Amino acid sequence: MSRSYVFWNSQSGKRGKEGLESLKAKLNDDELDIADVINFAGYREYLSDIKGDDKIYIVGGDGTLNRFVNETDGMNITNDVYYYPAGTGNDFLRDINTTPEECPVKINKYITDLPFVEVNGKKYRFLNGIGYGIDGYCCEVGDKMKAEGADNINYTSIAIKGLLFHYQPTGCVITVDGKRYEYKKVWLCPTMNGRFYGGGMMATPGQDRLNKEHTLSSMLFYGKGRLKTLMAFPSIFKGEHITHKDMVAIHTGKDITVEFDRPTALQIDGETVLGVTKYRAYSAK
């Protein structure tokens, strides 16, 4: 009899537990092997005895998925892998046009040959995108608030306050497949595998995570002051920011390096990396 390995994230709070219980109800006829990814030995050890007809279920948000694809990288998993959303964000689910009611959803085709990012001497796979600029700043501030005991973090509020008062834009050099571009007063410069990141921002509406060329897209918000940038910024949630040609640019390629002129926080699928001046994102193919 096949088994179902269920991995969930207890740090997703109440939503994580609710997601686990909801999935268990849907899989009530299956033999379940449940593990909390915060308190277990790791995927490699846990899945060492997995059989060919066993299934894998990931319960959590984008960060939980990111951890799975990085910790299983190189394991050549051929089993069916399913995703069941819990926590906040869920930009991956939004990008593949799937609702929570339609889950669990099989995700094997979405987690094969994922792109890499190199930052501060380390290399990671990423699922949705690399946030750099005020979006990384928002994650940095949000992490501090969580450490101080805050539960519901309003990242939109953090972004607005950052645009108005706290965040300082940077100079930026972006190199796309060997071609160099320079920008001044850059507010953010994410590089995307999908369209969505940051809890619903459609940064690159033309990006397709399954495109046959395996290209990535970088988007820059640049060149304007605080008030004009703040007025245009909400349009990113519908992907309409790209109509602001004088302050938004998109570059597409397979090998993209972004350099800022001062250290700035970066986020990889919602996971924060501090003090970054440069990152390189590139296709696995």
Task: State the predicted function of each range.
Residues M1-V59, T64-N66, N70-I77, T98-E101:
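ATP/NTP phosphate-donor binding region
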Residues Y5-W8, A35, G74-W187:
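Catalytic core of DAGKc-family lipid kinases
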Residues G16-K17, R67-N70, F92-R94, Y137, ...:
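Short glycine-/acidic-enriched loop or helix-start segments at secondary-structure transitions
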Residues E21-K24, D73-G74, D143-K144, P205-D208, ...:
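Short, solvent-exposed amphipathic alpha-helical segments in soluble enzyme
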Residues K123-G131, Y137, E182-N193, Y197-G198, ...:
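Short hydrophobic-aromatic micro-motifs
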Residues K146-S157, G194-L227:
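Gly/Ser/Thr-rich active-site loops/lids in small-molecule metabolic enzymes
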Residues Q168, T175-R195, G199-L210:
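Mixed-charge interfacial surface used for oligomerization/domain docking
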Residues G178, L210-E213, L220-K285:
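ATP/nucleoside-binding phosphotransfer catalytic cores, i.e., glycine-rich phosphate-binding loops
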